[in-house]
């Protein structure tokens, strides 16, 4: 039988396989390519099968033809060419027509066996390469997991580490970036719509490289920006670990490579291949195969701000060959500028100080800002840090009581330092002193606990070592140097033995990957020691005479430091100066001298005060955030007498606040400011939605307890703009209003004050000590429910003269309640805005009664409401009353037609107080203007300003208006923009305006196409009558 014959032949071939080859044969049976149409044999059945059983299994599973094809293919795969060629020649003829229908890869004519053998080997080689790549990726992932699964605490003992997954606490990320210029423009235009319409967008780590929408391209470059200690590095390491663990970017990237920018910048010559090799677990990774698909590679470049060479746009020829050796900075610049492996993706971390420079190097990056910990995540971090739950709860409760310190803990580094200090205090049985309000205070406490002398000669040695650290830090800051060699340490009087001690205490961290290089554990610690360099009194024997050292130390003249502060290219000095202010606090100085047995100079206090005076009076300081930055310096000091003297130099304060820290800093400084004349605060709502939920508790907003203790003209002219205010915050803020003797203006526009907050404000406004005269509450989420409270204020507070309630849904019922207070004899309100308050004609009877009874109201703006002709007619009836003192009336976009113009005309002819009338956006038409002009031409009409923009006018009304212009003795401004007056109408105006009897000073026209004759007439008019201004307004 044929079946037996094929099985026997196949068994004989398998019998020729030695034990090793037979095992290989069975292995390939399990991994046989499925695209060849055969069923792989399960290991359980082949493992103990001999050659006969194996042949039978192969035929039973796949049939004779496919079983034979499998055997031939596997003979080639295990490199048994003899059996391959023999089986090819001995292959049975399948089917009645002798056609060979088995796999074409193994079926060919007799004379092409050699050719097929070579082709098959090439195919098997490709399979082997793919398998090898897959195997190497597996090996690389395992290495990355091993490398990044643990982190070392900065105060860890030798060999101690912490699981990254157990310690990591999720950070807030927002898809947000504003250039330096945009930030300045936003600060100068506080409260503008542009600012309000730019809410931040939270983004998850797994979506960083996803397109913005289905029509967009995927993102290839992501920039992580954030302040020092905000968590940029830990986030990058977490990304590496998650990818290697198979939970992140599995479908996007085959390889992630983590690059220390500061380490690479030290290398003189290195290729990208060398750089990739340094990231791999063995010396011979398949580099060629890795870079073959650059789109599947992600480079995580950590610390761009520490790569100084990358700032230089004229760095020289860039590298395009991944095998070519270049300087480290050129190599990274080539990657960033997409000259080297342009298809590869990049994730770059940087401090904001380097962001503007980085922006010029990138093409369409996605900017992501790290905001640190939310309140909930701060609590989570405490419970992860303390292994003992009771300790964690006690520590967190303690920090919650200190608002300032708790708020600072949004920065992960500060959170770690605070936890470390608390844990040390708990373990030693001591309680934490409640004096740590600033970063300086926290660092002083932390460092003093590590540097306590043991007495005797150690005290002298400690001072010498501390001086060495300070000079090393300052030298590094001025030379923008972060990594130091042992020779640098010797030049600053730090011997190798001294460094070992500091390593154990973690003032220095020895870099594992950069042998014989040392760095401060964090950039802020280097900045802290650099500040101390200007305060520590030098040892008598001096340090400038270190044997064999040619070291030239930076100048200790603090004026040199201060002169360079604030310069963009000297941005690295900002934190040094902040720490300097923090360290001259007298109590802090005494504490350090006692703890470290070192002398600290207080002589620079007057120089700092003088510098503040010069900066405060400089005109360029008006460009923010310079003023706020000076407040940060004063806040670090936490010495009220000094701060009060410094704040006397700020008669005008204009700052825009966008972070919690900004709130704290400004609040502290304003509380200590007694001579300010003008205050403008802008509070930007700059938090993702998850943070809004936390704000409902009102915790961080309570820090702004003060707006102004005593000022002669305190105008929060854009104060609290677009801020998320809560009732608890309002009580803290508004309590100041009842104690400030001269705070007269308060703007709370564009925030979520709401009716509850408004009730709190109204309580304060009724206080006898409240001197608010002007109050702006536009877009505050108010309704009719708060109108009774406002009415009580109007009937009791005789100081309030201006009130803006625009863009709040007060409704007709709310206005009825409001009018009760407006008609009260004690109400002195002069100006009232009710624009876009959801009003109808139903409220006009109440408003009209106010017009006829109020002795003070002179300006009423009720535009953007559906009052209609009937509603305006009711108002006009009372406005004709001789007792009506109304001077300005705004009826913009009120749904008016020519029907109401007779009523308006009668007011114009009888009310000599009315000087301004705003009617733009109403379809009055030419007929309406004709009626209006009857009143305007009356001798008793005193109107000075008339706005008729977008009133559906044509050239037909120009005769009536021309007659008005030659006759009116009062009209000075006429606005006719966005009306189709045509050339004929404008030419008519030109003739009239030339006349001496025309007293108009300002004419508004649409910016439209005029013929040559009309343009010439307008030009001639302005030449002949220079006192007349013609304004061309854009057509809507």
From Swiss-Prot:
Disulfide bonds: 8-108
Cellular component aspect of the GO annotation: cytoplasm; cytosol; endoplasmic reticulum; extracellular region; Golgi membrane; interphase microtubule organizing center; membrane; microtubule organizing center
Motif (KFERQ-like motif 2): 603-607
Listed result of changing residue 689 to R: Abolished ubiquitination by the SCF(FBXL2) complex
PTM remark: Phosphorylation at Ser-198 by MAPK8/JNK1 increases inflammasome activation by promoting deubiquitination by BRCC3 and NLRP3 homooligomerization. Phosphorylation at Ser-806 by CSNK1A1 prevents inflammasome activation by preventing NEK7 recruitment. Phosphorylation at Ser-5 in the pyrin domain inhibits homomultimerization of NLRP3 and activation of the NLRP3 inflammasome: dephosphorylation by protein phosphatase 2A (PP2A) promotes assembly of the NLRP3 inflammasome. Phosphorylation at Ser-295 by PKD/PRKD1 promotes NLRP3 inflammasome assembly.
Record has Zinc as a keyword: no
Annotated effect of mutating residue 324 to R: Complete loss of PYCARD/ASC filament nucleation
EC number annotated for this UniProt entry: 3.6.4.-
Mutagenesis / variant outcome for changing residue 745 to R: Abolished ability to activate the NLRP3 inflammasome
Domain Pyrin: 1-93
Protein name: NACHT, LRR and PYD domains-containing protein 3
Source organism of this protein record: Homo sapiens
Name of the coding gene: NLRP3
